[in-house]
Amino acid sequence: MKFLFDLFPIILFFAAFKVWGIFTATAVAIVATLAQVAWVAFRHRKVDTMLWVSLGVIVVFGGATLVLHDEKFIQWKPTVLYWLFAIGLLAARYAFGNNLIEKMMGKQLTLPHPVWDKLNVAWALFFAVLGVANLYVVHNYTESQWVNFKLFGTTGAMVVFIILQSLWLTKYLKDE
């Protein structure tokens, strides 16, 4: 259910794009992300840093798209977001000694610290590659194809990455 909740703004963006085009879809994505943050704040009293970053990036890049009437800004938004996540994961670990992946998943999984470090780097690389893939699609395909990639391509890549990661992690999990 959380996975669908996380996809809420993207799904609404996709639907609005198909009906009204990129600029209305951008406005819908901004409002949907604001609503998502408001709901999380109301329901849980605490909003994850990643969601705040997502909100900031959609407001800045979506706002630039609407104000300047240039769709390139919203198309660059996923790349900027993915690269911020990648940099954040690596900076937290290597500059501040905090493994954010371990902090997020440590209660669910018991893993040796070197495995957590590999997982952290894997996620950072995954986000970096997603950012590059997004730029490739933006510059080599139509706007409609990019929107399809944004929903189906990146979501599919995420699912495949999580499955592969889960298979890799099974050798480190202890029978409980």
From Swiss-Prot:
Pfam families (alphabetical): IspA
Keywords assigned by UniProt, alphabetized: Cell inner membrane, Cell membrane, Membrane, Transmembrane, Transmembrane helix
The keyword Metal-binding belongs to this UniProt entry's keyword annotation: no
Membrane topology: Multi-pass membrane protein
Record keyword 4Fe-4S present: no
GO cellular component: plasma membrane
Major location category of this protein: membrane
Transmembrane parts of this sequence: 3-23, 24-44, 49-69, 81-101, 119-139, 149-169
Location of this chain's protein in the cell: Cell inner membrane
Function per UniProt: Plays a role in cell envelope biogenesis, maintenance of cell envelope integrity and membrane homeostasis.
Recorded family membership: Belongs to the YciB family.
Name under which the protein is recorded: Inner membrane-spanning protein YciB
Native organism taxonomy: Bacteria, Pseudomonadati, Pseudomonadota, Betaproteobacteria, Burkholderiales
